[in-house]
Amino acid sequence: MNTRGNYSNGFTSKFFKPYLPSESGDDLVLPISFNSCLPKSLPKTVTVRSISGNIWKLGFKKCGGEVERFVMVSGWKKIVRDENLNGGDLLSFEFDGSHFFNFSIFDHETTCKRLKRSSEQSKDIIKVGSDCEEESQASDDVIVLNSDDSDDSDNDYSVEDDNVAEDDDGLEDEVDVEAEDGYDAKDSDGLEDEDDDEAEDGYDAKDDDGLEDEDDLEDEDDERRYLDDHENPYFTMTLNPKKKSQLHIPAHVIRDYDLTFPERITVVDEMGALEKAIKIQKNGCIFVKGFGSFIRRNKMKMTDKMICELKRTGGNLVHTIKVKIISG
């Protein structure tokens, strides 16, 4: 099965293929129905990139016979091994029309898109109803600079500096992030404070009668005027002094638009672009790391509001976050 979508600079085509170990060799045969999506001038090699950031280069050739077929050669076994594929996983290949394939995996048991694997080969999947996606989260919270955050040095403003910023041991303290970002925050009586959650979560504000507040609808319309494309997903954020320097992508935005993220992403403001790393936790929560440099260079105040517009490809892969700061 293959489908077509649109990139901002052209068209993209996609095909789906189940992984069957008994039929899998060192080559990957493309579906015959996908032949019409290939360019007349075939590339000698193609680049395959998984959603977790792994990249492979494979040969690309045409096979003769009664029916013309096209094959990715010399490297498919490595992809199977690197991504720890299981029989029945559904594979998605999105072609940019030239020589590049974005590669996604849908788990055979949950049918959820796999985001990233840990070093122990565990599968991290965003699931509707997971702990990360509870609407009681304080999803309007963003972090501020923390001097302990080694991914957020003062030598910012350049892509190169952000590329080398890492924790001392090369690992990320996921437990600390969860605790400080409020996912398991509880009162002294051991119960979650629902009033605080409602106050912090401004996405689905409702009156007592269960209807959306008209003022909230007007605010949403007012915020969309700052977007380059009113159809793009977006969210609003304000600073929270209790957070580390990471920008949390609200789970409901990811779920509603079926968004996926690469290993690194571009953050754009009026001063230019910064390249930042994406962090995907085991529970599926997604963060932009090293966001303190963005806060510093814009000299943001606690009363300022950020409108974050997510720009994506035809396959809903987010490549850029454009941030508009509204002075408070």
Swiss-Prot record:
Superkingdom of the source?
Eukaryota
Its predominant location is nucleus
Keywords of the record, alphabetical order, are: DNA-binding, Nucleus, Transcription, Transcription regulation
Q: Which GO terms describe its biological process?
A: synergid death
Q: Where is this region: Disordered?
A: 145-221
Which compartments is it annotated to reside in? Nucleus
| InterPro entries hit by this protein | B3_DNA-bd (IPR003340), DNA-bd_pseudobarrel_sf (IPR015300), Plant_B3_domain (IPR050655)
What the entry lists under PROSITE patterns is as follows:
B3
Q: Please provide, alphabetically and separated by semicolons, the GO molecular function terms listed in this UniProt record.
A: DNA binding; protein heterodimerization activity
Xref: Pfam families: B3
Q: Give start and end residues of each DNA-binding region.
A: 13-109
Question: Cellular component per GO?
Answer: nucleus
Q: Where is the composition biased (Acidic residues)?
A: 148-182, 190-221
Q: Looking at the keywords, is Transcription present?
A: yes
Official protein name in the record: B3 domain-containing protein At5g60140
